[in-house]
Amino acid sequence: MKIKFLIFPFIFFLLIILVLFYLLIIDRNPSKLPSNLLNKNFPKIEAVSLLKEEKFLSSKEFGNEIILVNFFATWCKPCIDEHVFIKKFSNEKKIKVIGINYKDNPKKTVKWLKKLGNPYSNIAIDKNGRIAIDWGVYGIPETFLINSKGIIKYRHAGPITDEVYNKINKIIN
């Protein structure tokens, strides 16, 4: 009977150690989370446009060109950090940059863009997060690169850094 009382705590302790060890060894980098959309057509978008009077339709916005789709919000600190790179992509004119404003206040977004500069050719408002769900977004910022045939070729979860910027440029060229 005493042996049973000693074995159960030992097994419990061993399980806790195994769980902790597992949590330490798994890679927790969100940019390495898999996307089911890679090498597939982009999900269609119908939303209110932040910049234009007409409805945002991906069928109009996504033509026969390379497109960078960036999910962002004004309350997102990493979005502010990556904004420099988004502007760089826009200024280079190699690709069209589309923004998806995720669960944000449109008036704040307009002010934010006036202050930091607007790199987006158009911005869809994702008020309730439905577009992000359709795209499999884990969190923001998150960026997708779509080729001229409408196929998602690259996805990055997290802010764009020098390394990611260079990686996207290699794919484009």
Where are these regions (language model features)?
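Thiol/disulfide oxidoreductase modules built on the thioredoxin-like
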Residues: 114-119, 126-172
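Short, Lys/Arg-enriched, disordered terminal segments
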Residues: 1-7, 28-31, 91-92, 96, ...
